[in-house]
Amino acid sequence: DGEIVGRICGIINQIAKEKKKNKKVRFGWFDFIDDFEVSSTLLNAVAEWGKSQGMEILNGPVGFTDFDHQGLLLEGFDYVAPMASLYNFPYYSTHYENLGLTKEADWIEYQVTVPTKVPEKMERVAQMILSRNKLRIDKVKNAKEIMKKYGYSYFDVIDAAYQPLYNFQPLTKEQKIYYSTLY
């Protein structure tokens, strides 16, 4: 009837496919009305496309990179979602189950009250760690100053820190350039 009832994006990370022999087709931006025919048609389209490209596993919801939103909200619908999180309607989880999708990892968010002053003991431990490891805190005003001072090596630190995280893929040079322009 010409009415938009859903959307989905299929993504193949060519670097992961070639270097790690990763056979996952990623899906994201998966939104749909509460109609199983719609959700199954959308997901099956990505699955079939992925198979035609040699992929064997559906992985999502994720984005183009690991810095994009990912995951499915399963509880906590009565709270305001943080800006860095995805939001979806409660019926999504039923659709995912009916589509045969299973949870592979848990992402848990907490609300933390930050104290107005750093506790004295924490300050002492921090100073001890800095001293022992010959580290320093470099104060910068903004992301542009970080880029000017450190260039793209800044992203090497991010890649190293994120490496142990679920499903992480290091950033390409092009992605580093792109993200450096956002801030």
Q: Over which residues does each language-model region extend?
A:
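A short helix-loop-beta-strand connector motif used in the catalytic cores of GNAT acetyltransferases and
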Residues: 1, 181-183
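Conserved beta-strand in the GNAT
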Residues: 3-13
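Asp/Glu-centered strand-loop micro-motifs enriched in Gly/Pro and often flanked by an aromatic residue
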Residues: 11-14, 29-31
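Feature marks short, surface-exposed loop/turn motifs that line or immediately flank catalytic pockets
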Residues: 14, 64-68, 116
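Acyl-donor binding region in acyl/amide transferases
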Residues: 19-100, 105
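A non-catalytic, amphipathic alpha-helix used as a structural packing/dimerization or gating element
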Residues: 41, 45, 153-160, 178
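Acyltransferase donor/substrate-recognition loop-hinge adjacent to the catalytic core
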Residues: 86-167
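Conserved GNAT-fold acetyl-CoA-binding loop/helix
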Residues: 163-181
